[in-house]
Amino acid sequence: MIQTKEDLRLYLEKDKQALGITRKRPCLVGDDIWKFEIALRYHEYLTNVNGGGVTRLIRRKFWGFLHHYFGIRLGFSIPINVFDYGLRINHYGTIVVNTKARIGKWCDIHACVNIGESLDKKAPCLGDNCWIGPGAKLFGGITIGNGVMIGAGSVVNKSFTENNITIVGVPARKIKDTGDPY
């Protein structure tokens, strides 16, 4: 969670790095995914930090509006305080994430992904360096290890706590060890 201005700067820089962007600020036209991530991070920061009075309230409402606006425009339903830094959203398109989900650093997510809770009201927890392919569905109180690659169209409804593996299928199953990329 973003608690300080230093955290906010770190998150913004790492998100920009994950998107492969070298410019200082977004273009007036385009860069909508980057603009969404900036609005998401400012909204997180202003929601998590107490104090500031009316000015902070107005700023929080403004960034909350931008977060919501870009989310609707791009098809994203990504709540605050779910993703750690290094979020990379690859394409416009439907991405739905439950507010209870927790996703680690350097997550790479594609279009048409759904990360939701199950009937028992538990949501997924993903480790760092995860890659989630287009159309993947993750639900329930599952835990996914670090460096896991989830194939396109996979349905993940059980935990995979091993690190650096590839899982695919309906329901998902491990197909290989990918090795540590670092």
Language-model features: locations:
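Left-handed beta-helix
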Residues: I80, Y85-G86, N90-T99, G104-K105, ...
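Charged/polar, low-hydrophobicity segments characteristic of intrinsically disordered regions
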Residues: R73-N81
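Terminal amphipathic alpha-helical/low-complexity segments used for targeting or macromolecular assembly
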Residues: M1-L74, D180-Y182
